[in-house]
Every structure is written in structure tokens, then in C-alpha cells.
Regions:
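Acidic/histidine-rich catalytic neighborhood of metal-dependent amide-processing enzymes
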Residues: 1-74, 80, 104-107
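Active-site-adjacent substrate-binding region
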Residues: 48-163
């Protein structure tokens, strides 16, 4: 068994200040890390889904009813098993991204990307936030807009996948 850290980062919207500091500190200390998992917006579903590249619609569909697992190359090796476990609880799609996600900047917009930049394996679990949720970062982003049964499925899937 390995130690598990639960870390809540601050200032993601200001340049991922907290996660960048921890990733750099771990790298400087030559600290090994099996996997960093960033939980980024997990409870919104929609009959429509946006994408950073139109071609992604053909692969991932046009309904925002899934959770996405976005991983760099090293973490991508874990994707099949994680996706199977998550998929038993909630529709799950995977997006392995090469080169730290630089070709698709929108996949770098959370606290996992500083870990990618430091050479760590990292995974973002997301409902795709603003690509489907019109309430994202708005006053209307309230619990009433969330799909709580979907969120429960995400939590159950994470417990199975990472447990």
C-alpha cells in the first residue's frame, strides 16, 4: 500500500498557484508519485456537449452525460482499468493526451497540468465544466442545477477505481 494524500488546492483560476507549488516542491525533493488525480467539476449533465475541437464530437458524442478521464502518457496506461471501474457506475470516456496536452490547451485548465509539467503521471476527472455547463462560474451555479444521482455515480466509480 502507498500513502494517499488528499490535497485541496487554492487559486487554480489564478494560474494553478497551489498545485504548481506542490508539484515543484515534490520534484525538487525527488519525491516519487504514483498518480495525481484532479477532481474537476463532477456533477453537471446536459443534453448537449461542446468540445475544444469539432472532430472530438465524432468520437465522444453530442450529449453531456459522461465523466471524462483525461490523462498524460504515463497515467494513460492506467486508463483502461480506471475507465472500466468508473463505467460500472457512470458513463465514462477517456482522453489520453500526449505532450502534456499542449495541442489541446483546454485539457490543461486544472490542477493536474503542473504535475504533467513536472513529469508526473496525472489524471483529470471532469464533467467537462464550461464545455457543457452554462452556469460554470456564474451566480446561477447552484446545487439545484446539478445532477446529484450522476454525481453519486462518479463518487462510487472513483471509490471503486482508486480504492
Amino acid at each position: 500500500r502507498r500513502p494517499v494524500w488528499l490535497v485541496a488546492f487554492d487559486q487554480e483560476e489564478w494560474g494553478m498557484v497551489g498545485s504548481a507549488a506542490l508539484a515543484a516542491q515534490l520534484k525538487q525533493a525527488d519525491q516519487a508519485l504514483k498518480l495525481m488525480v484532479s477532481l474537476e467539476m463532477l456533477a453537471y449533465t446536459s443534453p448537449s456537449q461542446g468540445y475544444p475541437h469539432p472532430a472530438m464530437r465524432a468520437v465522444y458524442g453530442d450529449r453531456g452525460n459522461f465523466i471524462a478521464l483525461v490523462a498524460n502518457a504515463g497515467a494513460g496506461l492506467l486508463l483502461p482499468g480506471l475507465a472500466r471501474a468508473m463505467g460500472r457506475h457512470v458513463p465514462t470516456k477517456v482522453l489520453p493526451v500526449p505532450n502534456g496536452g499542449r495541442a489541446i490547451p483546454d485539457v490543461r485548465l486544472s490542477d493536474h497540468s503542473p504535475f504533467w509539467d513536472q513529469g508526473y503521471d496525472a489524471l483529470m476527472v471532469t464533467d467537462t465544466s464550461f464545455m457543457r455547463n452554462p452556469h460554470y462560474h456564474q451566480m446561477t451555479d447552484t446545487v439545484e442545477t446539478l445532477d446529484l444521482p450522476f454525481f453519486c455515480g462518479v463518487v462510487e466509480g472513483l471509490a471503486e477505481a482508486l480504492g
